[in-house]
Amino acid sequence: MVKKMTRLIIFDLDGTLLDTIDDLAAACNHALTACGCPTRERDEYFMLVGRGIDNLFRGALPEDRRSSAMVDRMRSFFLPYYNEHSCDLTRPYEGITEMLDRLEAAGIRFAVASNKYQAGTEALIDRFFGKYGFVSILGQREGKPIKPDPQIVIEAMEGVPEISKEEVVYCGDSDVDMLTGINAGVRTIGVTWGFRTRDELLAHNPWLLAENPGEICEAILQDMK
């Protein structure tokens, strides 16, 4: 791992900062039932989430019912349910708040770049991480491309123009996140506690593969010495 000073960490949200899988699965199964479709098992959702809610719906729906109209119908049931129940079982992963505390105390800036819809992203950050001064909280928005398109990371970096690209790292739990960082030209951190596998992350040669949040702290703070 090459030493480089880090001043901004851009985080993915689901599977990286927060364990959201149970609430996402419950909301999607609620929508499937409302649409007259069979539900999915919880573990199936680990591979379905992470590419925006429309792709979540397409993946969860039976193959013969993946029309645009059905995706719209799924959204109409999913959003009200998830907005009400998004914090029922969702929690920060162990060690996340301690990591953020240590990094913030060292002067590291934070941003979030997620494929979760914007209102949902903002609500969860406010609920669980409201005390931290995120420079940007960015989710999926109408007319904006989703990850792995790098635009969302570039937009987050534009919020702190005094920080160079070489001082930025993007942190996530999936191949989509690793590709997003690569496409944006920044270093990547893959986290093994999220929704995807170590092998999926290692295939994209992350700057750091972290087994726990403490390892992120150690790597970032060591490079400041």
Predicted segments with their positions:
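Asp-based, Mg2+/Mn2+-dependent phosphohydrolase catalytic module
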Residues: V2-I9, D43, E104, Q118, ...
